[in-house]
Amino acid sequence: MKLLAIDGNSILNRAYYGIRLLTNKNGVYTNAVLGFMNIYFKNFEEVKPDRVAVAFDLKAPTFRHKAVDTYKANRKGMPEELAQQLPIVKELLTYMGIRIVECEGYEADDILGTLSKVCSDSGGECCILTGDRDSLQLVNDRVTVRLATTKETIVYTPERFIEEYGFEPIYLIDLKSLMGDSSDNIPGVAGVGQKTAGALIKRWKTIESLYENIDGAELSKGVYNKLINGREDAIRSKWLATICLDVPVDYDIENYKISERNDEKLSDLLTELEMAKLMQKLGIEPSEKRASEKTVRAVDVKTQLKDIDEEILGGFLKMNSICYLFDGKAFKSAQRLDDENFITVSYTHLRAHETRRHL
């Protein structure tokens, strides 16, 4: 059993800034969608998971925001060009049969941590895909983190982490407790940087052990005073930096198997987004081609046109979003074919970004 757990917001954000702004002919931004899907497929092909979950943040404040009002208070809002692409990515994932996981009051990191624990406790292997180093604290013998960077994806195993940091992954929390994290507005201990914090954690592992032994720790006077004065900040910072492992989400890993793909909806949406290469990768045809090649409904020529309107067209006729297709050609109204036994009727609902068929 292998679960690929993806930090949706982090990967989408990285995809957005990694590709220049792109739009389709209708002005819909698509660069983040394209980048996200490229990153997804690359990692899916390398990991070869049999289960996939994509975690997203919600707009509602988390338990951290409620407890510490300065937490992430320095973050700017999501650019509108990116915000427009978030629901599109979620729609694509849904049509691809991939499980989306969200939980009010918690961050995507917490969901990833919880799923990785559930998976590893069940004897499975979890690969976390993210652009955020916070998740490195989750690395263990059954959990690896694939850190997406601008140039490459770095795979963190316990050995790789120790080689880089000099201590075990779980103590990354304590490192951040001392040095802080400006991106999340976690203060840490004022005046203690990464080098000093790293040396302290290599020796003492946890801030609890450090403070228990601080009087005999043979620290310089400056570092000693900073630690004493910043003790409360260190404790609060550790709490903020610790990923929650018991988020109330679906704990049944079987439910994260990829479900049946909806090729019709995928084709319609990807045609709208003008992503031909992605359609080719998925092995599906553009919706226009399918619409022109497929007889949607055969109606006996004796059937009155008004009956077809009432049954098939309904209120869509008033929205001016109807066209009839016959032999691959579109008409403003249905064509009566006296020399044939049937007519073919189809319609397009443009506002919903999809070609609909009434069978």
For each feature predicted by the language model, list its residue ranges.
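Noncatalytic, basic helical substrate-engagement surface that gates or grips nucleic-acid strands
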Residues: 1-129, 133-155, 159, 233-236, ...
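A residue-level signal for conserved active-site and pocket-lining positions in enzyme catalytic cores
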Residues: 7, 54, 112, 132, ...
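Non-catalytic nucleic-acid-binding/docking modules located in mid-to-C-terminal regions
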Residues: 48-53, 98, 121, 141-144, ...
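Charged, flexible boundary elements
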Residues: 101-111, 288-314
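Gly/Thr-rich phosphate-binding beta-strand-loop-beta motif of the actin/hexokinase/Hsp70
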Residues: 314-334
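Short, intrinsically disordered, charge-balanced linker/junction segments flanking boundaries
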Residues: 330-331, 337-346
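Conserved small/polar residues in nucleotide/adenosyl-binding loops
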Residues: 348-355
